């Protein structure tokens, strides 16, 4: 049951799509405070949710701010990253969900100030509070997801492997990447283009020197099973003769200063205006710009810098230059030097600059900071709504850096500018179920790490987790070590682990689609699947993938294995990636186990009484198009028989809901499998 309580006059975020809900007279569970709510926690209480954030699956012990922030240092001391996800579940003596529908800053003090107290602070008394009660943790998530709407469904090829870099500078560099993947039997479905494909960093342009025949090049790549996925940034360059800029100025489609003139900030191209994503006309106009690239054969995009990131606001920059002139005349001691460097550092993403510009919304003129968390959501919404108009029968790939709840209906996310740190493998695992709770099923980290120099073993171990995330993308920053998998010594292991991803695709795609269509979770904490198991509530480095698999990746350097907790008897599945993905299986009882895992191995666990559909002929697969989703191998641990509801479709159209997409597979106690519409062969 979902209950709603309104405070003040909230801005309609359009995050909620559910029908009328009963208004609460009194608030259950929470104590009303002048600036929010509090809840007295018991020692056994666990806090789940809050989407993409630092620290563990259990959010107790830290303070989190819902404030979309451009911050590439994802360390434990941070309180906010790129998104705002105001949904959490308290699980313990009371079990309930909380959603704060508010577009500005919300603080979740999860036992940081007071170890035993959850405090939720809202910047203004204009918001909707939702309390969700359910029969289980998964039921609470299900009800919440029905409230906020169906999760984004990408094309099937978007579940393939993607290779990215800041930046592949021209056509020949992209061709080289594809050729090396193919030469080393490493499947690949997409090459991602960062900012240097553009003409002087201008949105919806292509540099004619680097990509002289872009449409022909996109067709050339698609003929090899490769899609190009270009980046789109939030800022529009101020340049006479640039059509996007001139149209935006002419029609008043940009965010404005208090006096109504277009607000000026600096990002990649220098001085830019920000499209007013909260103005419906401006949003539709910006979305229509994607047609320029769609018409050239592009079928996928990623939206970046859409918190929005601000290198500098023009007015602050002017004041900074003036102050620098004053400092230039001084003998800088330690205090004045610190003030000088601090002044320059405060140019970027300064909170005060977000109070300088305004949006023209359906609900009137709004200062940006009061609706800050909606910008990235509505940039991706602009694209998603345009795709529905321009390509009504076709799925287009879209993922974003910034997001809040509501955006999950229009695209996925990648989890931003992580680092080549071992701790960030574990952080990526922590984020997966928390994002799933909030509706963001299509998500993934930068495999190998974006910042810093990576190592071969780190990339291999990261793929050991990444092959289970819906978005599988290797990405790294300009100036760092190149980390395409074919550049490392152990090419057979990399080829095997990427082929394993494609062997798993029938299961991964089926579980993703069922989660999206049924408002469920593709990835969940162990406690969601095993609610009666007290120890499962404490496990922070294992998750469930779909209904059948438990994964426990290795995330420490030089480790040749790890301890794993199994809540029930399971089948250990060991894949020898360097040996053509040879599979070894053994049954393990419930409890704690030390599991050896060599660098070229992937180990996961199949639940008793469950089935795992796999593709065939991994060595022949170069892209998702080579996977036969109707001709399956079946891995099973089902001494008493089992059944599985398998989903598959054409992977291209938006016609998701047909009953014929669901295929029933059964396995009897004698090991005989049958299916109404798929060919299956039992292997274990």
Predicted regions located by residue number:
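Extracellular structured ligand-interaction cores
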Residues: 82-86, 93-95, 103, 126, ...
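Catalytic and substrate-binding clefts that recognize carbohydrates or anionic sugar/phosphate headgroups
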Residues: 1-155, 165-166, 171, 178-183, ...
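Short acidic-glycine loop/turn motifs at beta-strand connectors
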Residues: 89-94, 257-259, 567-568
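Catalytic core of carbohydrate-active enzymes
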Residues: 73, 374-375, 380-396, 402-413, ...
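Aromatic- and carboxylate-enriched substrate-binding clefts and catalytic-loop regions
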Residues: 187-494, 529-530
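N-terminal small/glycine-rich loop or linker at the start of catalytic domains
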Residues: 150-164, 261-274
């Amino acid at each position: 049951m979902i209950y709603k309580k309104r405070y003040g006059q909230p801005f309609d975020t359009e995050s909620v799509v559910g029908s009328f809900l009963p208004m609460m007279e009194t608030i259950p569970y929470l104590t009303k405070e002048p600036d929010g709510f509090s809840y007295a926690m018991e020692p056994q209480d666990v806090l789940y949710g809050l989407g993409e954030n630092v620290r563990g699956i259990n959010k107790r012990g830290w303070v989190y701010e819902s404030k979309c922030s451009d911050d590439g240092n994802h360390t434990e001391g941070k309180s906010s990253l790129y998104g705002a996800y105001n949904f959490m579940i308290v699980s313990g003596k009371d079990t309930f969900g909380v959603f704060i529908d508010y577009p500005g800053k919300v603080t979740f003090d999860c036992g940081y100030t007071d170890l035993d107290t959850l405090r939720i602070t809202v910047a203004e008394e204009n918001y909707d509070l939702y309390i969700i009660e359910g029969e289980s943790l998964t039921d609470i998530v299900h009800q919440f997801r029905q409230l906020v709407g169906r999760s984004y469904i990408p094309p099937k090829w978007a579940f393939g492997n993607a290779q990215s870099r800041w930046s592949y500078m021209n056509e020949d560099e992209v061709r080289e990447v594809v050729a090396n993947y193919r030469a080393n039997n490493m499947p690949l479905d997409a090459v991602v283009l960062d900012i240097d494909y553009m003409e002087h960093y201008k949105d919806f342009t292509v540099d004619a020197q680097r990509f002289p025949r872009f449409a022909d090049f996109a067709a050339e790549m698609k003929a090899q099973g490769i899609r190009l996925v270009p980046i789109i940034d939030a800022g529009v360059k101020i340049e006479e003769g640039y059509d996007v800029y001139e149209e935006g100025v002419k029609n008043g489609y940009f965010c404005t200063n208090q006096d109504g003139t277009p607000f000026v900030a600096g990002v990649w191209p220098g001085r830019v205006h920000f499209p007013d994503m909260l103005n419906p006309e401006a949003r539709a106009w910006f979305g229509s710009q994607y047609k320029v690239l769609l018409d050239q054969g592009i079928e996928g995009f990623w939206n970046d810098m859409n918190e929005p990131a601000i290198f500098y606001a023009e007015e602050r920059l002017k004041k900074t230059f003036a102050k620098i002139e004053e400092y230039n005349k001084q003998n800088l001691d330690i205090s004045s030097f610190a003030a000088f460097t601090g002044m320059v550092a405060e140019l970027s993403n300064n909170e005060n600059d977000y109070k300088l510009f305004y949006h023209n919304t359906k609900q009137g003129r709004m200062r940006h900071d009061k609706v800050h968390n909606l910008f990235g959501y509505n940039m991706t919404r602009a694209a998603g709504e345009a795709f529905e108009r321009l390509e009504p029968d076709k799925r287009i790939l879209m993922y974003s850096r910034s997001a809040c709840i509501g955006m999950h209906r229009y695209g996925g996310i990648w989890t931003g500018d992580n680092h080549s740190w071992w701790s960030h493998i574990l952080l990526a695992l922590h984020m997966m179920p928390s994002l799933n709770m909030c509706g963001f099923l299509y998500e993934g980290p930068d495999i190998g790490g974006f910042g810093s120099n990576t190592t071969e073993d780190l990339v291999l171990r990261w793929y050991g987790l990444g092959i289970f995330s819906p978005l599988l993308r290797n990405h790294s920053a300009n100036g760092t070590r190149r980390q395409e998998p074919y550049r490392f010594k152990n090419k057979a292991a990399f080829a095997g682990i990427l082929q394993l991803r494609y062997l798993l695709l029938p299961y991964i795609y089926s579980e993703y689609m069922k989660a999206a269509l049924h408002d469920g979770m593709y990835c969940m904490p162990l406690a969601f699947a095993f609610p009666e198991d007290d120890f499962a509530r404490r496990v922070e480095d294992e998750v469930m993938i779909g209904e059948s698999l438990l994964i426990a990746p290795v995330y420490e350097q030089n480790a040749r294995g790890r301890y794993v907790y199994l809540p029930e008897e399971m089948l250990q599945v060991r894949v020898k990636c360097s040996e053509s993905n040879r599979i070894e299986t053994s049954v393990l009882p419930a409890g704690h186990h030390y599991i050896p895992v060599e660098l070229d191995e992937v180990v996961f666990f199949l639940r008793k009484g469950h089935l795992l559909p796999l593709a065939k002929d991994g060595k022949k697969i170069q892209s998702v198009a080579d996977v036969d989703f109707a001709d399956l191998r079946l891995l099973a641990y089902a001494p008493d028989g089992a059944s599985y509801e398998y989903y598959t479709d054409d992977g291209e159209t938006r016609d998701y809901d047909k009953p014929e997409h669901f295929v029933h597979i059964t396995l009897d106690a004698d090991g005989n499998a049958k299916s109404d519409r798929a060919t299956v062969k039992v292997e274990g």
